[in-house]
Amino acid sequence: WIMGHMVNAIEQVDKFLNLGANAIEFDIDFDKDGIAQITHHGIPCDCGRKCTKKAIFTEYLDNIRQVTTPDDPKFREQLVLLALDLKLQRISSAKAYRAGEDVAKKLPDHYWQRGNSRARAYILLNIPLVEDYEFIRAFKDTLKNEGYESYNDKVGINFTGNEDLDKIRDVLEILGIHKQVWQADGITSCFARGTERLKEALEKRDTPGYNYINKVYAWTLVRKSIMRRSLRLGVDGVMSNNPDRVIKVLKEKEFADKFRLATYNDNPWEKFRG
């Protein structure tokens, strides 16, 4: 999976897909009451990027629904995964549950259209910190209460704050989540990051019977040398400002026979058995 990073304006979607991304990440900004308002990262952000691109969240969902719906004029077959980077750290932790309720209503309204949409992308909920886990509880509670619990099959969980992996496991255990879990490891492209935690996540992913990490990705990679390093370690995905660079690295002799781009037929919730 090649995740285009910080794709917050509607016009950026095609740009990142044209560069080779088969997944996109966009930021969800909430008001003080936990209501999802816009797709927006804000300052600071990655080096060399404009931090202020934005769209109204519901309008963004309406557009991305078309892009991921077969036979729609806007359909792009390669886009199979949407990563929602939930900016919960900007609101009170007490509002995390309300935020989860809100997103769990807006997705059925604007993406799945209450069962009337054929939009098919998988969705990854990126939670910044384990202290915001009530968002997940609210999201699942609300889908159930709204009668759309079946959509949980299309939704995965990911904690992005580089926290202790055992602490994350404990929270997932509290929530009763034992599947459909990704684990991110990374830092803004402005800085270098070691591989200790990334290696630990990959080791846990590959441990038989360990159900708290199904996929691992590294972010935000812009240098080809770091992309190569991550691929050698065996990541499932790379988040990048430059998907075209990832494509070029994947075509190199060292990686061409070991990796390929994920398609809709690849289940993002299953561990890869090479």
From Swiss-Prot:
Function per UniProt: Dermonecrotic toxins cleave the phosphodiester linkage between the phosphate and headgroup of certain phospholipids (sphingolipid and lysolipid substrates), forming an alcohol (often choline) and a cyclic phosphate. This toxin acts on sphingomyelin (SM). It may also act on ceramide phosphoethanolamine (CPE), lysophosphatidylcholine (LPC) and lysophosphatidylethanolamine (LPE), but not on lysophosphatidylserine (LPS), and lysophosphatidylglycerol (LPG). It acts by transphosphatidylation, releasing exclusively cyclic phosphate products as second products.
Cystine crosslinks: C45-C51, C47-C190
Keyword entries, A-Z: Cytolysis, Dermonecrotic toxin, Disulfide bond, Hemolysis, Lipid degradation, Lipid metabolism, Lyase, Magnesium, Metal-binding, Secreted, Toxin
Protein name, as recorded: Dermonecrotic toxin SdSicTox-betaIIB1bix
Organism: Sicarius cf. damarensis (strain GJB-2008) (Six-eyed sand spider)
Family of the protein in this entry: Belongs to the arthropod phospholipase D family. Class II subfamily.
Stored InterPro entries: PLC-like_Pdiesterase_TIM-brl (IPR017946)
Binding site for Mg(2+): E25, D27, D85
One GO cellular component term: extracellular region
Protein localization: Secreted
EC number: 4.6.1.-
Keyword Protease: no
Keyword Lipoprotein belongs to the record: no
Cofactor requirements of the protein: Mg(2+)
